[in-house]
Amino acid sequence: MSTIIDIHAREILDSRGNPTVEVDVTLESGAFGRAAVPSGASTGAHEAVEKRDGDTSRYMGKGVLEAVAAVNGEIAEMLVGFDATDQVGIDRTMIEMDGTPNKGRLGANAILGVSLAVAKAAAEFTNQPLFRYVGGASARVLPVPMMNIINGGEHADNPIDIQEFMIMPVAAKNVRDAIRMGSEVFHTLKKELAAGGFNTGIGDEGGFAPNISSTRQALDYILRSIEKAGYKPGEDIYLALDCASTEYFKGGKYEMKGEGKSLTSAENVDYLAALCADYPIISIEDGCAEDDWDGWKLLTDRLGAKVQLVGDDLFVTNPKRLEQGIKAGVGNSMLVKVNQIGSLTETLMAVDMAHRARYTNVMSHRSGETEDSTIADLAVATNCGQIKTGSLSRSDRLAKYNQLIRIEEMLGEVAEYAGRSILKG
């Protein structure tokens, strides 16, 4: 009854209007799962391959018909007849079919779409919500949101070098309150920016993209908005940054054009340490570039005891890259993006490896998203305690927040909000 009888993929659009892969999986029982695959703007060189057609006559070369054909062709032919509850076996079969180290033949977007849709169909077959099916009886921790309220870098058309300025409402009683607190700060920030003469257009992830060039000016606006919304920075709400510094690491230097700075690795660490000394910043993602291992080591030695140092481009949700980082003693947290590695099984393996090494995990969206809310379920399934899913606008971001509210309601009295437990030191 849990046998897969049909797998069908199609090309749909993501939140940036670019094509992506959506997959439907149907079981013999009638159970059904659907998953849409996200895509990133600032992508790590070590990520699994997102297969694009390259046909410039369609979608400027960004079509995904080849990935769709791979699903509807050889993947479906191989997997129809499999038991959907054998997630590991299904994912392993697709990885072996692909036969490359980075899923470059079939495409990680093809493999992941099937992997997630299978999990959803199996969850429906077993009459469980996805978070419970994947995480088991212990899945009950609601994550602290990292809410990206000012966008820069590759996510916005402004001169801000740092890609994401985020707030983390750790003092909330539950995830519902955390989302409310974030919304109140978001709307207060809009008024503050407008009063300062800045535009209030939004970036890819729903945060504002004002024509600010100074990191400190952006942070000051956020602090003022937190206070005017009735909260205390560094007590009720903390700050987090995603530098995405690989994007401005050129020729061995951190070229921060918006700020007019050209920094060595050591100077970049000094720059970030000064920000942490002056602002209540508790998390920095990709503070150093993906292959600047010496810079990462300096950063970890300097700030790792008191600041969460998240590897995104550094680790790319890949157990091999993570193992390398653990052995080198760099970073203390892994950003979890399912499409960086390309299957649910490998994602869960990486999360478990990070957990065993006492690294934290942060479940994350991509800048190119859809209405698919799978990562909300995965955040609870893994009890990771933190989620990055954008700002308090754009339905592609709010779909995840709304799903967290539903999950918290489903869990009832056993639900736990991670809150202050995520703080270091």
Swiss-Prot record:
Binding site for Mg(2+): 242, 285, 312
Main localisation: cytoplasm
Note accompanying the cofactor annotation: Binds a second Mg(2+) ion via substrate during catalysis.
UniProt keyword list: Cytoplasm, Glycolysis, Lyase, Magnesium, Metal-binding, Secreted
Binding, (2R)-2-phosphoglycerate: 163, 337, 366-367, 388
Catalytic residues, chain numbering: 205, 337
Subcellular location: Cytoplasm; Secreted; Cell surface
Any one GO molecular function term: phosphopyruvate hydratase activity
Pfam families linked: Enolase_C (PF00113), Enolase_N (PF03952)
Swiss-Prot/TrEMBL cofactor(s): Mg(2+)
Pathway entry: Carbohydrate degradation; glycolysis; pyruvate from D-glyceraldehyde 3-phosphate: step 4/5
SUPFAM superfamilies documented for this protein: Enolase C-terminal domain-like, Enolase N-terminal domain-like
GO BP annotations, alphabetical order: glycolytic process
Catalyzed reaction equations: (2R)-2-phosphoglycerate = phosphoenolpyruvate + H2O
Entry EC no(s): 4.2.1.11
UniProt keyword Cytoplasm present: yes
Recorded GO CC terms: cell surface; extracellular region; phosphopyruvate hydratase complex
Purpose: Catalyzes the reversible conversion of 2-phosphoglycerate (2-PG) into phosphoenolpyruvate (PEP). It is essential for the degradation of carbohydrates via glycolysis.
UniProt record similarity statement: Belongs to the enolase family.
PANTHER family reported for this sequence: ENOLASE
NCBIfam families from the UniProt entry: eno
Descriptive protein name: Enolase
The organism of origin for this protein: Cereibacter sphaeroides (strain ATCC 17025 / ATH 2.4.3)
